[in-house]
C-alpha cells in the first residue's frame, strides 16, 4: 500500500512539474531526441552488419552433412 501512495504522489508532483516547467522539458527533449536517435541508429546498424557478415573461408553456412540440398 505505501508503494501505491508513493507512486500516486510522485505522479502528481511530476505532472505539476511538467506543467510548471513545460518549456524546459521541451528544450531537454529537443536535445535528447537527436542523441537517442543516433544511439539507436548505431545499435541497429551494428545488428544489421552482424547479420550480413560472411562466414570465414573454409566454413560453410550449413555444415550438417545430413541435410539434403
Curated annotation (Swiss-Prot):
Topology in the lipid bilayer: Multi-pass membrane protein
Which branch of life, at top level?
Bacteria
Q: Which residues lie on this side of the membrane: Lumenal?
A: 24-31
According to the record, the segments passing through the membrane are 3-23, 32-52
The species is Magnetospirillum gryphiswaldense (strain DSM 6361 / JCM 21280 / NBRC 15271 / MSR-1)
Which keywords appear in this protein's UniProt record, sorted alphabetically? Biomineralization, Iron, Magnetosome, Membrane, Metal-binding, Transmembrane, Transmembrane helix
Q: What is this protein called?
A: Magnetosome protein MamI
Q: What happens when the gene is disrupted?
A: No magnetic response, fewer, smaller magnetosomes which do not contain magnetite. MamC localizes at mid cell in a short chain. Magnetosome vesicles are approximately wild-type in size, shape and chain-like alignment, but there are many fewer vesicles, only a few have crystals. Deletion of approximately 80 kb of DNA, including this operon, leads to cells that are non-magnetic, lack internal membrane systems, grow poorly, have reduced mobility and take-up and accumulate iron poorly.
Q: What is the lineage of its organism?
A: Bacteria, Pseudomonadati, Pseudomonadota, Alphaproteobacteria, Rhodospirillales
Q: What does this protein do?
A: May be involved in an early stage of magnetosome nucleation. Not essential for formation of magnetosome membrane vesicles, it is probably functionally redundant with other proteins. May bind magnetite. One of 7 genes (mamLQBIEMO) able to induce magnetosome membrane biogenesis; coexpression of mamLQRBIEMO in a deletion of the 17 gene mamAB operon restores magnetosome vesicle formation but not magnetite biosynthesis.
Ranges in the Cytoplasmic compartment?
1-2, 53-69
